[in-house]
């Protein structure tokens, strides 16, 4: 009798396990491979708008993404004057449809940030040399993130600065996405030509913050916790 009861209990346990594993709702979700499925569309056109804040004069470029990189309709450099401030806006399109809103969504804002690295000669790839490159940039120009909410309106049109509402520790601090921002040129600079590598980093982790919870600096892009959604190089001329 005990053997029959033991067999019956074993049968019930096995039946329960099989039934539980067969429920679709209880099956573990298969995580997305974000190197392939980014969770947003990939743009095929970019509009770059540089505005001199002292004159409101604009210099606009349109870039088309090709297998060989971004090809611009205008190869002339953005010109910055010593002591000047320049608002820089990046607008992404898919077949002429604006998609910036996808990068500031509840899911995408925490894991997207633009980085701006200005350099002369060849871009430095080693970590130590890139740190020196960033210091050299800081001696010439600095950048301040100034993304807006909603993203398709300006501050003068009633938009507000976009905040890190997703950051439970600092929900009232600025969200560094980089679709909009301001470059401030130092006053004691010489007339020189530069290149600026702009990359939109897609972070492969919970969010784009450093492990200590601090924001990453605009010209210090990490190399192992992200993939670039976009990378483009722009000519910059600074005039004394």
Question: Which residues fall in each region the model found?
Answer:
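Bacterial Sec-dependent N-terminal signal peptides
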Residues: 16-44
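Sec-dependent bacterial lipoprotein signal peptides
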Residues: 1-19
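Internal, hydrophobic beta-strand segments that form the core of beta-sheet-rich folds
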Residues: 87-92, 164, 169-218
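Short beta-strand elements
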Residues: 211-240
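Short edge-strand/loop segments of extracellular domains
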Residues: 104-125
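N-terminal edge beta-strand
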Residues: 54-81
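Beta-strand cores of secreted/periplasmic/IMS beta-sandwich domains, seen most often
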Residues: 76-95
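Extended, solvent-exposed segments with strong compositional bias
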Residues: 129-181
